[in-house]
Amino acid sequence: MIELTALAIALSMDAVAVSIALGSKCEEEIRQLALKAGGFFGVAQMVMPLLGFYLGVQLHDYIGGIHHWVALGVLGFLGLKMIREATQGEKELALSSHPSSSKLLLLAFVTSLDAMAAGLTLTLLGLPLWFCLLFIGGSTFLLSFGGVHLGRKSGTYLEEKAEYLGGIILILIGVKIFIEHS
């Protein structure tokens, strides 16, 4: 359960960083934006790992004996990518103070691509898939909701720190899985 909690927090950090950025630009209707962003990001973080999980099931015969290497590679790559983006300040989409639903959907998709890749590793947690998906999605909703409010109060200061922390957590989970299954 500790691994799932760490994974959920790490995967949600891109969404949290975007939520903080959205909140920093929000001039009014903060609660509505927080609910909307949390909803979009939470659902995307449930769906994308499911797609990754089913991709992993299809590839099981090919990667079954080296799954711990795959987990280390995928999570390590994603973690390093998040750290690089945080340190270089890369932003993929310009944010406005009133993002449309289509813009939020696009942001949710972009921020959940890492979750799809991480879905390949969900079987290694030894927990029911539905529980993992609900936990990851629910955690992302709550953290994104809070991120919008936090962004309103802190501006963009915390945005890159959230991505940096998420990257470190993903790398540590990958190393832990590798050590446990080697």
From Swiss-Prot:
GO cellular component, one term: plasma membrane
Regions that span the bilayer: 2-22, 37-57, 63-83, 104-123, 127-149, 162-182
Domain of life: Bacteria
Localization annotation: Cell inner membrane
InterPro entries: Mntp/YtaF, Put_MntP
Main subcellular location of this protein, as a coarse class: membrane
Topology term for the membrane: Multi-pass membrane protein
GO molecular function: manganese ion transmembrane transporter activity
Keyword list, A-Z: Cell inner membrane, Cell membrane, Ion transport, Manganese, Membrane, Transmembrane, Transmembrane helix, Transport
HAMAP family: MntP_pump
Family stated for the protein in its record: Belongs to the MntP (TC 9.B.29) family.
Record's function text: Probably functions as a manganese efflux pump.
Protein name: Putative manganese efflux pump MntP 2
Source organism of the structure: Wolinella succinogenes (strain ATCC 29543 / DSM 1740 / CCUG 13145 / JCM 31913 / LMG 7466 / NCTC 11488 / FDC 602W)
Gene label: mntP2
